[in-house]
């Protein structure tokens, strides 16, 4: 579960390394974001010559959480870290690669590109 002020890792090659959640989108009183939710983030750490720079405010979709996701068969898939993939204002991916595993629950019309770019889909 990601909330405001949470520091999370970036799982793409956009140039950002760590970002901070500044807003969970989807309602005025919404507090937590789970896998597949869109959040507003601020870049806190970035590499030189990347596509984004420190201080940029962007959208991001949550692809991994330590809380995990519960499947219909009762299984729970958890990860070692919280990670997001950066999006632009039109909710298109900024990077061209996705690192680490992602879950099948991202398989919606909006985020099918993340599934196709990911090396491992659980």
From Swiss-Prot:
Question: Keyword Flavoprotein on this protein?
Answer: no
- Please indicate if the UniProt record lists DNA-binding as a keyword: no
* Keyword tags: Ribonucleoprotein, Ribosomal protein, RNA-binding, rRNA-binding
MF terms from GO for this chain are:
large ribosomal subunit rRNA binding; structural constituent of ribosome
What is one GO cellular-component annotation here? Answer: cytosolic large ribosomal subunit
Q: What InterPro entries does the database record attribute to this sequence?
A: Ribosomal_uL14, Ribosomal_uL14_bac-type, Ribosomal_uL14_CS, Ribosomal_uL14_sf
Q: What is any one GO biological process for this UniProt entry?
A: translation
A Pfam match? Ribosomal_L14
Function as written in the Swiss-Prot or TrEMBL entry: Binds to 23S rRNA. Forms part of two intersubunit bridges in the 70S ribosome.
Subunit relationships: Part of the 50S ribosomal subunit. Forms a cluster with proteins L3 and L19. In the 70S ribosome, L14 and L19 interact and together make contacts with the 16S rRNA in bridges B5 and B8.
Q: What family does the database annotate?
A: Belongs to the universal ribosomal protein uL14 family.
Protein name from the UniProt record:
Large ribosomal subunit protein uL14
Q: To which species is this protein native?
A: Coxiella burnetii (strain RSA 493 / Nine Mile phase I)
From the UniProt record, report the name of the gene that encodes this protein: rplN
């Amino acid at each position: 579960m990601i909330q405001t002020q949470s520091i999370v890792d970036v799982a793409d090659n956009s140039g950002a390394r760590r970002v901070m959640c500044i807003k969970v989108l989807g309602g005025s009183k919404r507090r937590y974001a789970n896998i597949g939710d869109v959040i507003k983030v601020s870049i806190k750490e970035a590499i030189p010559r990347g596509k984004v720079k420190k201080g940029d405010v962007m959208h991001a979709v949550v692809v991994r959480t330590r809380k995990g996701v519960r499947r219909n068969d009762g299984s729970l898939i958890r990860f070692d870290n919280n990670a997001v993939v950066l999006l632009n204002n039109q909710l298109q991916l900024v990077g061209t690669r996705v690192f680490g595993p992602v879950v099948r629950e991202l398989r919606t019309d909006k985020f099918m590109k993340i599934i196709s770019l990911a090396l491992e889909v659980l």
